[in-house]
Amino acid sequence: MNSLENLILVGVIKSCHGIKGHVMLKSFTDPATKILERNLVNESGANIYIKLISQNAKGELICTFNDIATRNEAEHLKGYKIFCLRASLPELEEDEFYIADLTHLPVLNQDHKEIGKIKNILNFGAGDIIEIEFSDQTTELLPFNKEFFPIITKDYVILNYQREA
């Protein structure tokens, strides 16, 4: 059994597709099909076997699971999370990060004072966006780049941004 600390979320089932038990898989890997090169598991650490049927223009994967043959069976998979073992991931280059390692990191200002935490990392197609939850419980979305985040470590990020009063 694997703890969630040893697992990295790499995809989620968005919906059913067609009548043969196919599902729409939103992959968090780049490229999207890279998810299929990993040994995939569920939250309990049990192996998951997925077969690619096709990929749509949005980069979402249309897949099937070995034991799912009908739309009714596939309906229960909506929101199903797919993981891989952290130990199976490749080493990253400098200035590369896994989303799981950045989420919940403290956000510090230029004076190294904690002002919030990274709540989420989003991507709507034009680059990564960092959602920050500030100490006053408000949130803001900022582009994930060196201008806004000049220093990123495994323990915190520095934010170069002045909030409006």
From Swiss-Prot:
PANTHER family hit by this protein: RIBOSOME MATURATION FACTOR RIMM
This protein's GO CC annotations: cytoplasm; ribosome
Complex formation: Binds ribosomal protein uS19.
Single GO molecular function: ribosome binding
The protein, known as: Ribosome maturation factor RimM
Highest taxon in the source lineage: Bacteria
Species annotation: Rickettsia rickettsii (strain Iowa)
Comment, domains: The PRC barrel domain binds ribosomal protein uS19.
UniProt similarity note: Belongs to the RimM family.
InterPro entries the record matches: PRC-brl_dom, PRC_barrel-like_sf, RimM, RimM_N, RimM_N_sf, Transl_B-barrel_sf
Function of the protein: An accessory protein needed during the final step in the assembly of 30S ribosomal subunit, possibly for assembly of the head region. Essential for efficient processing of 16S rRNA. May be needed both before and after RbfA during the maturation of 16S rRNA. It has affinity for free ribosomal 30S subunits but not for 70S ribosomes.
Keyword Chaperone appears in the UniProt entry: yes
Domain PRC barrel: 94-165
Keywords, sorted A to Z: Chaperone, Cytoplasm, Ribosome biogenesis, rRNA processing
Subcellular location: Cytoplasm
